Design a protein with these regions (language model features):
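Glycine- and other small-residue-rich loops at beta-strand/loop junctions that grip anionic moieties
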Residues: 27, 31, 99-102, 125-127, ...
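Alpha/beta catalytic cores of nucleotide-metabolism and tRNA/nucleoside-modifying enzymes
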Residues: 37-40, 45-47, 58-60, 64-72, ...
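Alpha/beta enzyme core
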Residues: 1-24, 32-120
Length: 187
């Protein structure tokens, strides 16, 4: 909190070997009670809202009850905001890059989590390429959307968020301005 952060996100979704060796990332989904303890310790020590980003499964443990149990354990520990990357993380056999493309997207899991835990907020992540897609997810009951690579490759798309998602008047901005504003965050 002393550094001006609004929240802390515990990422339980990264499948890289380097991250696994440190017992971080997606492999943590195999230990939901440990993640719940970490969540509570982080929230208590920081005093900040703490969120969890996770996949829908790990390796061949990717049926809905697996992710439902993971989220349920965290929900019981007090977590109320989940960012759901709607792909399974394969810890062996796929590179991090392949893990972003090869496992199929299962957005129905995010919708079902929202139904099962209606008091929690669920943001969907994974394979979202346009603001129009984002709006569809929100219009259909999810609380938010996390856009990754699409925003990285086309940062100027973010200039239309208020227009597309919230119906505000279009705000014209040149790509050069977007890059200049984004550069301030890269240093």
């Amino acid at each position: 909190a002393q550094y001006g952060y609004d929240e802390i996100n515990l990422n339980c979704g990264c499948p890289s070997e380097r991250v696994q060796k440190g017992s971080f990332g997606a492999c943590l989904m195999l230990e939901p009670k440990l993640v719940a303890e970490c969540f509570q310790a982080i929230r208590e020590a920081s005093g900040l809202e703490t969120t969890i980003k996770h996949r829908i499964g790990v390796d061949h443990q990717d049926d809905y009850p697996f992710v439902q149990n993971f989220v349920g354990t965290l929900y019981e520990a007090g977590c109320r905001t989940f960012i759901v990357h709607v792909r399974t993380a394969f810890l062996k056999g796929l590179s991090p890059r392949q893990n972003r493309d090869v496992p199929p997207l299962k957005p129905d899991y995010a919708y079902q989590l929202k139904k099962d835990f209606p008091q929690a907020q669920f943001c969907i992540n994974g394979g979202i390429l346009t603001l129009e897609e984002s709006k569809t997810f929100i219009d259909n009951g999810l609380d938010g959307v996390m856009v990754g690579r699409a925003a990285y490759h086309e940062p100027w798309m973010l200039s239309r968020v208020d227009e597309v998602l919230f119906g505000e008047e279009p705000h014209e901005i040149r790509r050069k301005e977007v890059v200049e504003q984004m550069t301030a965050y890269l240093h």
